[in-house]
Amino acid sequence: MNTRLEKFYKENVVPALMKEFGYTNPMEVPKLVKVTLNMGVGEAATNKKILENAVADMAKISGQKPVVTKSRVSVASFKIRDGWPIGCKTTLRRAKMYEFLDRLINISLPRVRDFRGVSGRSFDGRGNFNMGVKEQIIFPEIDFDAVDAIRGMDIAITTTAKTDAEAKALLAAFKFPFRN
């Protein structure tokens, strides 16, 4: 079962990147490995309902059940103890990853207020891209009226690219809206 974006990758992106970077083998072309979603909910230490709502929101957005993350150390200034739940995360691979990216690029990011594109400087030096979303309501799966609080999330896109230039070319070929 190939998703729309996966089919686009095989038919359009691979030949374009082979030509641009001079690859001789299609297996050399960088590809997407995984997309990791992380939602830190610091208020979850005091109220369990907040964490349940965050987990439900992320499950709707990702299409799979997230894992609850727990604190590793006690921090008095944050009023948390070792082992307390403080957020949730999920990792998307294969078909769910392509479906999520398709929705992110074509539906969710254009719904962001005053959206001018994502920063092209958010690469880590090894071909991975990280971005943050300030509101979870940009995703079409979230019902605006049922939301108890506006929460942001981190999105990490992991690729097989060796350099940031290759990774940026890969995401740009997917029509990722870069600002610069």
From Swiss-Prot:
Pfam families in the cross-refs: Ribosomal_L5, Ribosomal_L5_C
GO terms of molecular function: rRNA binding; structural constituent of ribosome; tRNA binding
GO CC, alphabetical: ribonucleoprotein complex; ribosome
GO biological process: translation
Keywords annotated in UniProt: Ribonucleoprotein, Ribosomal protein, RNA-binding, rRNA-binding, tRNA-binding
Protein family per UniProt: Belongs to the universal ribosomal protein uL5 family.
Known role: This is one of the proteins that bind and probably mediate the attachment of the 5S RNA into the large ribosomal subunit, where it forms part of the central protuberance. In the 70S ribosome it contacts protein S13 of the 30S subunit (bridge B1b), connecting the 2 subunits; this bridge is implicated in subunit movement. Contacts the P site tRNA; the 5S rRNA and some of its associated proteins might help stabilize positioning of ribosome-bound tRNAs.
HAMAP family registered for this protein in UniProt: Ribosomal_uL5_B (MF_01333_B)
Name the UniProt record assigns to this protein: Large ribosomal subunit protein uL5
Species per Swiss-Prot/TrEMBL record: Xanthomonas euvesicatoria pv. vesicatoria (strain 85-10)
